[in-house]
From Swiss-Prot:
One of its GO terms (cellular component) is polar tube. It comes from the Eukaryota. This is Polar tube protein 2. Its main location: other. It is found in: Spore polar tube. Residues 255-265 have a biased composition (Acidic residues). Residues 1-18 form the signal peptide. It comes from Encephalitozoon cuniculi (strain GB-M1). Interacts with PTP1 and PTP3. The gene is PTP2. GO terms for biological process: sporulation resulting in formation of a cellular spore.
């Protein structure tokens, strides 16, 4: 009995009792009051709105500066164009070699080759016309070759009263050829198909011209293309009659080996100095 008690005591003494786990006190949670939370959110929102407002003001300022720069550029261009026009006017009329009529404008367009330029502008789209405010620009590709200022120099465009068309004429298909000129006779628009003017139709103008533009004065028919349908029709008819006569003449002279008038026709340069294609 004593032995059993002794063994029990030894076993009890050698048993390892697990140490009790003492829970650590948790850190207190810092809860932000609802009113303070709203203040933080409002602060972030205010900063975002402030940034957006600064960006908006910067954009407005940028647009304002850009608009002012563009306006100043147009004003300088207008002044330059007026100066160029006045300089050309002071030179007076000039005659081209061979006695051809030249009526200069700001862009120095030769009226005798105007139809060829129109043909390019309308059909080949080599030239394009852009209207911005009171300025008209003529481009060849992306290159600005003329700046026309639509100001009143005291010259008035030639206007003729429209004749009342008969019912028969009204039903006939009308040619869709139109040219638009400003008050100093410069081409500012075109639509339709135009023939190239034959340079033989361009002869010296009779009598001195007061200005280099002859929107108000007479010149010969070959150099009098001012955009009126009557003059254009006459020029087309003259060319068609001449082509018919030349065709009959060439048909009778084929045996002699002579070419047609079209083969001998010299191609004229355009206003920017390049030949017609």
């Amino acid at each position: 009995m004593l032995l059993l008690l002794a063994i029990t005591a030894v076993v009890s003494a050698t048993m390892v009792h697990p140490s009790a786990v003492v829970p650590q006190p948790a850190a207190p949670l810092h809860v932000v009051p609802p009113q303070q939370q709203m203040g933080m959110v409002n602060g972030c929102t205010s900063k975002k709105l402030e940034g957006a407002e600064i960006m908006r003001r910067n954009m407005i300022e940028c647009q304002k500066r850009s608009s002012e720069a563009t306006k100043a550029m147009i004003e300088r261009a207008n002044e330059k164009a007026v100066e160029s026009f006045n300089k050309e006017v002071s030179k007076g009329p000039s005659q081209k070699d061979g006695g051809q009529c030249i009526e200069k404008a700001v862009q120095g367009t030769d009226r005798c080759i105007l139809a060829g330029i129109i043909d390019k502008a309308v059909n080949k789209r080599k030239y394009r016309i852009s209207d911005v405010e009171n300025s008209t620009s003529l481009y060849r590709g992306d290159k600005l070759i003329a700046l026309i200022v639509n100001v009143d120099y005291g010259l008035q465009p030639i206007t003729k009263p429209k004749k009342k068309k008969s019912k028969i004429m009204a039903n006939l298909p009308q040619p869709k050829r139109e040219m638009y000129f400003n008050q100093i006779g410069q081409l500012v628009g075109a639509r339709g198909t135009f023939p190239q003017e034959n340079k033989e139709d361009c002869k010296p103008c009779e009598g001195p011209k007061k200005t280099v533009e002859t929107t108000s004065e007479k010149c010969n028919l070959g150099c009098e293309l001012k955009g009126t349908s009557a003059l254009i029709s006459k020029a087309i008819q003259k060319k068609e009659v001449k082509d018919t006569k030349e065709g009959e003449k060439s048909a009778s002279q084929d045996s002699d080996g002579e070419g047609t008038a079209e083969d001998a026709e010299v191609q004229q340069p355009s206003a920017d100095g390049e030949g017609l294609e």
